[in-house]
């Protein structure tokens, strides 16, 4: 999400350097940092873990019909795009098939396989590798994420050490459900549980 935001900021910057870094001081950068850039839109689920709805994509399409007013580009970041409902994804597909001029759409997801194939086939994909566990720990510490080491190790194994997935798991407590499923599955394999009771 942070990378997507930085990419959008660089695209909208009026004085980006040769390495494509936003200057941080031009008018476009300042209003982007203030969170009210007229040429940028961030779409995310309205509640943690909930779906991105078709009304949000309709609002995006309405906004994208306008020409840029400050920068040379219009940017859209859709966070956790895999949370789109089917109708929202179908609505977005039409925009991807006929993109507006000078418009960049950036979709982020921790689960690209959950995106419809029709969406994936119309996007240029960039896969970010997961950092090693020690780097993840340092980053979590810098973000002020506090939890005991044993709990963190369990969550980390369930989320494949993905830092943002760890934070999301802690915020939503979903990891406890996954841990229970893992324990039930282990008991089934070891024939220590009745499948009917677990169901």
Residue locations for each model-derived region?
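P-loop/Walker A NTP-binding region and its immediately flanking N-terminal helices
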Residues: 1-80, 104
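Conserved RecA-like P-loop NTPase ATPase core
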Residues: 4, 26, 40, 76, ...
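Conserved adenine-binding aromatic site and its adjacent loop/helix in ATP-hydrolyzing domains
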Residues: 62, 94, 117, 121
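Catalytic acidic motif of RecA-like/P-loop NTPases
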Residues: 79-85, 90-97, 113
């Amino acid at each position: 999400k942070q990378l997507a935001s930085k990419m959008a900021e660089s695209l909208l910057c009026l004085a980006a350097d040769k390495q494509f870094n936003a200057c941080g001081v031009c008018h476009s950068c300042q209003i982007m940092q203030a969170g009210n850039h007229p040429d940028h839109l961030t779409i995310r689920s309205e509640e943690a873990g909930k779906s991105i709805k078709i009304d949000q994509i309709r609002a995006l399409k309405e906004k994208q019909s306008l020409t840029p007013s400050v920068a040379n580009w219009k940017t859209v970041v859709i966070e956790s795009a895999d949370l789109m409902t089917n109708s929202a994804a179908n609505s977005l597909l039409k925009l991807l098939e006929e993109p507006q001029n000078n418009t960049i759409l950036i979709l982020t997801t921790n689960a690209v396989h959950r995106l419809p194939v029709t969406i994936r086939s119309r996007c240029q994909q960039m896969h970010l590798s997961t950092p090693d566990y020690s780097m993840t720990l340092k980053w979590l510490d810098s973000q002020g994420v506090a939890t005991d080491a044993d709990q963190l190790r369990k969550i980390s194994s369930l989320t494949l050490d993905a830092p943002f997935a760890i934070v999301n798991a802690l915020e939503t407590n979903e990891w406890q459900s996954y841990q229970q499923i893992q324990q039930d599955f282990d008991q089934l394999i070891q024939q220590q549980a009745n499948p009917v009771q677990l169901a």
